[in-house]
């Protein structure tokens, strides 16, 4: 079920009404309703995969209880590794089996040996990478004794499958979400209003930014071999904003929807394209994933402690695994490697957080000019990375970038929908300018004290959504494939 669908527009008010007006006196019934609603929401895509999430829930709930009772460290490790193997085993089979088989065959072919290993027709369960990491964080935290295991199965199952963030995040920690599900909740009018505003802002980013750019991005990346440098540059920039509008829009809708049920999810984006270096970008982009890898991979590997060589190893590990998490394709692995290489200089020189401190020290014209330069440079480098993320193969990505620096002819490009590149550029300039104005309001981007300003913003956003809505565009979210 898509957030931007008629189905969800009917589903959400029904669940909201039942939650606050029918079962509001009983916490257990509220949690049971959330669980049922979440399974209906997830089963809307393919009901067969409900058994997968149910099994994962049952396994990690049981192992959490066992970890809470067991004092012997050797047995506790067995329980932890059982959780890791089961969860990553499912993820590996459904998401990476064919990739490993094809890569294995290609490796033998490269060395002149022909072998035949059949691939399987595997359907990737929606959101498996997200809920796998969410439930894994629970068993890891219980193992580390950072979290008390819950004995309330319905509440735990609702935590794993909470529908607003189930299929594309934010990837919640049990330490944040589970206590909220376990405690009594009361309706908060102000929070609900904030939630609706966030949902409106997220829908605007999805419909007006992401969906309107989607056809032209698809067209440019499909026909890049015939296009000139200016058009290819625009294609890369447009994809940068498409994926940002798509993914951050989903996160805004998810966070806003959760607010309607009295639950606060973590921020997932903090205006990442205003970052002044790659380290800052990753503190602002997909925060729930980057902090997950930091806490459960980077720090256990040693983080920045120890020798520089080990620190560099850990940096490469976290970025490459992050790339691989996104998809079973060498393009994603290369994208992760590319970001590791971009991050490495500031890591080695110890300047990762330098510009954050400079920004806090007050306004200075020279510093401001330097920060603009750093922001533009960081965005340009991130956009180069997005070419690898979007391309079908690494070879396609390199050819795309090669044409940018070698084919300089200027031609008028117009997409069949009637809009010109300049129309999209003006749209993005408006969007960037507005985001800059609200950059300190990431939890409430369209809330203004003046009610007339608020009303004007609401009307403008709805008008633009109606103007740019295209029924022929694929309305699914990009990160559903991950």
What residues fall within each predicted segment?
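Membrane-embedded transmembrane alpha-helical bundles that form the catalytic cores
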Residues: 1-431, 436-481
């Amino acid at each position: 079920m898509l957030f931007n669908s008629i189905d969800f527009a009917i589903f959400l008010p029904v669940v909201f009404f039942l939650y606050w007006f029918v079962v509001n006196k009983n916490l257990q019934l509220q949690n049971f309703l959330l669980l049922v609603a979440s399974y209906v929401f997830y089963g809307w895509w393919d009901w067969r995969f409900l058994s997968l999430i149910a099994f994962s829930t049952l396994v990690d709930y049981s192992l959490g209880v066992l970890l809470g009772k067991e004092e012997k460290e050797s047995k506790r490790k067995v329980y932890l590794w059982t959780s890791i193997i089961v969860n990553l085993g499912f993820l590996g089979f459904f998401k990476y089996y064919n990739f490993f088989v094809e890569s294995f065959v290609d490796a033998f072919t490269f060395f002149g040996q022909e072998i035949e290993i059949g691939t399987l027709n595997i359907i990737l369960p929606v959101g498996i990478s997200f809920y796998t990491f969410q439930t894994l964080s629970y068993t890891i935290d219980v193992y580390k004794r950072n979290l008390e295991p819950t004995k309330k199965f319905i509440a735990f199952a609702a935590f794993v499958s909470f529908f607003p963030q189930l299929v594309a995040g934010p990837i919640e920690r049990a330490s944040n979400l589970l206590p909220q599900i376990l405690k009594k909740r009361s309706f908060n009018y102000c929070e609900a209003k904030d939630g609706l505003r966030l949902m409106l802002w997220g829908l605007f980013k999805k419909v007006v930014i992401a969906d309107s750019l989607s056809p032209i991005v698809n067209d440019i990346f499909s026909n890049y071999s015939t296009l000139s440098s200016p058009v290819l540059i625009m294609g890369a920039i447009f994809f940068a904003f498409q994926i940002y509008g798509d993914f951050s829009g989903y996160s805004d809708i998810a966070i806003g929807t959760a607010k309607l049920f009295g639950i606060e999810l973590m921020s997932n984006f903090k205006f990442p394209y205003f970052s002044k270096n790659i380290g800052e970008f990753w503190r602002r982009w997909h925060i729930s994933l980057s902090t997950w890898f930091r806490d459960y991979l980077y720090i256990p590997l040693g983080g920045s402690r120890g020798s520089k060589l080990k620190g560099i190893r850990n940096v490469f590990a976290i970025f490459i695994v992050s790339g691989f998490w996104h998809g079973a394709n060498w393009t994603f692995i290369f994208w992760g490697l590319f970001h590791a290489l971009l991050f490495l200089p500031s890591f080695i020189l110890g300047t990762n957080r330098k510009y954050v401190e400079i920004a806090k020290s007050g306004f200075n014209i020279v510093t401001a000019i330097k920060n603009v330069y750093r922001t533009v440079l960081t965005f340009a480098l991130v956009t180069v990375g997005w070419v690898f993320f979007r391309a079908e193969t690494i070879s396609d990505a390199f050819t795309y970038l090669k044409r940018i620096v070698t084919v300089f002819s200027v031609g008028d490009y117009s997409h069949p929908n009637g809009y010109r590149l300049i129309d999209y550029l003006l749209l993005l300039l408006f969007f960037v300018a507005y985001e800059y104005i609200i950059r300190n309001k990431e939890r409430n981007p369209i809330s203004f004290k003046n009610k007339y300003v608020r009303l004007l913003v609401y009307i403008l956003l709805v008008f633009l959504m109606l103007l740019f809505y295209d029924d022929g565009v694929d309305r699914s979210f990009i990160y559903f494939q991950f």
